[in-house]
A protein has these predicted regions:
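N-terminal glycine-rich phosphate-binding loop for ADP-containing cofactors
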Residues: 1-196
């Protein structure tokens, strides 16, 4: 491949991602950046099968949904990265893609999802406790709360209910048991039913 930057955006399953990386790193141009669009899997897990040289060129570029309308992009770096490449990638994403770009450390959910997924889970949990309809919940937990006009349930659906289930599993695995996120990370019966 002749690309300067290759973005992996497959399902949130580490086994599939590792197989893809094996193929990408065999074919890529030497020195090109390879990134994952994961929303929750730590870079240390994603890169565990990469060589030290490959790790220098690997990072996470987490684009928020809907990508066309959401300005935020998180670049998650590791201690292995060539920081000049990360800086160049950030500049490209800001100037050429028009993204508001944050450089993040490798923490569960990075920055945006650590806050955003928690807020979505709290909103959905409270909506069910209050016996709100989905429409009522989306009216309250939408634009007035800084969530896209889809509202919280609409956003959950837009992201992908099955993807959100994988994200929650990743958070549950990575966060300590006493973390407040664990209180709201349990499956919501309606969501579970929709996945089945």
């Amino acid at each position: 491949g002749e690309a300067d930057w290759i973005v992996e955006a497959v399902v949130e399953r580490i086994d599939i991602k590792h197989k893809i990386y094996e193929k990408i790193f065999k074919e890529r141009k030497s020195g090109s950046i390879v990134s994952s669009n994961t929303s929750s899997i730590p870079i240390k897990v994603l890169s565990e099968k990469l060589s030290e040289e490959e790790k220098k060129d690997f990072c996470i570029t987490h684009f928020f949904n809907p990508v066309r309308y959401m300005d935020l992009l998180e670049i998650v770096k590791s201690e292995n990265n060539d920081l000049n490449k990360i800086s160049s990638l950030k500049k490209f994403c800001e100037k050429d893609l028009g993204k508001g770009t944050l450089i993040c450390n490798d923490t569960p959910g990075f920055l945006g999802n650590r806050i955003g997924v928690y807020a979505m889970q709290v909103a959905m949990t409270e909506a069910f406790k209050m016996k709100l309809t989905i429409e009522e919940a989306d009216a309250v937990f939408g634009r007035p709360m800084g969530i896209p006009k889809t509202g919280v349930f609409g956003l959950y659906d837009l992201i992908g209910i099955d993807l959100m289930a994988d994200v929650l599993k990743s958070f549950i695995k990575e966060l300590p048991e006493n973390d407040e996120f664990q209180q709201v990370a349990k499956e919501i019966p309606l969501v579970k039913k929709l996945i089945e």
